[in-house]
Amino acid sequence: MGLSWSPRPPLLMILLLVLSLWLPLGAGNSLATENRFVNSCTQARKKCEANPACKAAYQHLGSCTSSLSRPLPLEESAMSADCLEAAEQLRNSSLIDCRCHRRMKHQATCLDIYWTVHPARSLGDYELDVSPYEDTVTSKPWKMNLSKLNMLKPDSDLCLKFAMLCTLHDKCDRLRKAYGEACSGIRCQRHLCLAQLRSFFEKAAESHAQGLLLCPCAPEDAGCGERRRNTIAPSCALPSVTPNCLDLRSFCRADPLCRSRLMDFQTHCHPMDILGTCATEQSRCLRAYLGLIGTAMTPNFISKVNTTVALSCTCRGSGNLQDECEQLERSFSQNPCLVEAIAAKMRFHRQLFSQDWADSTFSVVQQQNSNPALRLQPRLPILSFSILPLILLQTLW
């Protein structure tokens, strides 16, 4: 008789309670991952095709393929105006802000859509703060088992150690062997070599790819420096006859993938002032730099004794465009943002081996985004997902 009865909470309240518990604890990573694909160009095109006016404007832009690779002659200026008018009609559609992702499926299709919607940019009207790629947060930690390096001599250089770590990792080893075979001197076919290089730097874990390419060497260790310089198989990957840098850039701009990677590099490795203030974080600049490897604009270390990088091209014969050509050269060889990003990554790699981790597997998470809203949420044991809601629900009865 002394007991009081209270009605059970409605089912909707219970569901809301469970969701409120689950989202803060475990949804941080999944939401960040899902949001990366909210407005991909492939999805935006599907939305556009559902609207007759949008579909017609997009199809008209699709017929303007000639404007995607070269400026139009004067007699075709009317066609160019029509293309730009169609692009203007799409400014209120989701296509105008769509982006692609570096490791997405059907990346080539996505980039084709992007450049169809932005024909003016493909003609050289480059906006340095706009990249076709959405800048996402890297959430996977670096995991390496240094104990497996005991088979190497203690004084082995770090480039050899990173190469061994790749060899001991099935996926990295498979991808590295694929481009090694395609880029070998006997079988060298440059287009196949470049394709396999792109595959390696797109599919291998960043920890392995960056470790191989950006391994630090002692100044006097020429063997280590040569191993680092040969990482991308330059004898096959780089042009046999050194082209003019502006011609190389024009060739790159004619290809949607190369154009996109160059645009990404310009966006994230661009010094904004004479003091060398960089537009974005070092991790983004490095990712954009690695994205160029395997394209016509593949850069590399110029020697085995330093860490200066450059394009494999020359400015001889540039005529009135000499200054523009030299500026393009300096965007790699004397770029303060790129220089410091490479130096910082090499310092990080050196620190990994400076501690006594020989008997353990270490995991390092580098913060890739300064926006607190995009930072990774702490992962709690899965047990908490089942226990906490039950405890809280029990108090309601």
Curated annotation (Swiss-Prot):
Coiled-coil ranges from the UniProt annotation: none
Known glycosylation sites: 92, 145, 306
Lipidated positions per record (GPI-anchor amidated asparagine): 371
Residue ranges annotated as propeptide in the record: 372-397
Signal peptide: 1-28
Subcellular location(s) of the protein: Cell membrane
Domain of life the protein comes from: Eukaryota
GO cellular component: cytosol; external side of plasma membrane
Alphabetized InterPro entries for the sequence: GDNF/GAS1 (IPR016017), GDNF_alpha (IPR037193), GDNF_rcpt (IPR003438), GDNF_rcpt_A3 (IPR003505)
Keyword tRNA-binding found: no
GO molecular function terms noted in the UniProt entry: axon guidance receptor activity; coreceptor activity; glial cell-derived neurotrophic factor receptor activity
Membrane topology: Lipid-anchor; GPI-anchor
Assigned protein family: Belongs to the GDNFR family.
Function: Receptor for artemin (ARTN), a growth factor that supports the survival of sensory and sympathetic peripheral neurons. ARTN-binding leads to autophosphorylation and activation of the RET receptor.
Description of how the protein assembles with itself and partners: Interacts with ARTN ligand and RET: forms a 2:2:2 ternary complex composed of ARTN ligand, GFRA3 and RET receptor. Interacts with SORL1.
Name of the protein: GDNF family receptor alpha-3
Name of the coding gene: Gfra3
